[in-house]
Amino acid sequence: MPIAKSCTQFCFTLSDEPGVLLALANRLRAADITLLSLWARSNENQTSTMRCIPERDAQFRDFAKSAELKPCEETVIHVNTRDHGGDFIRVLETVAKLNANIDAIEAVALENQTGWIITTDKSHIDSLLTQINDAT
């Protein structure tokens, strides 16, 4: 059964060079920051776009300020479930019932668990959380 919660996703840009991600990971470890999600993509202008969901928002904000990352923040929905056939479809049906548009969705399955990060208009977050959690 899916469990959904609201999370803050931070987005920032780094240079796209060998070792930059490792350096960031080492700094995060030194600051004792745990990430629930990390996504990185190269851009055409020798930069990379990073998106992450930290376990503790305030701690990451302090880190980002000291590291001069200048992140933007957005509220996303993090859905986690044990793999049961049809959970993905049920979540999408819930989104459709509310006539909410998904701006982006990312998914990963590991060790019989599946997780999704759903980005949608902020006005839909609370109703989607309620509907996803009540549908189970």
Predicted segment positions?
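A conserved regulatory-domain signal marking ACT and ACT-like small-molecule sensing domains
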Residues: 1-136
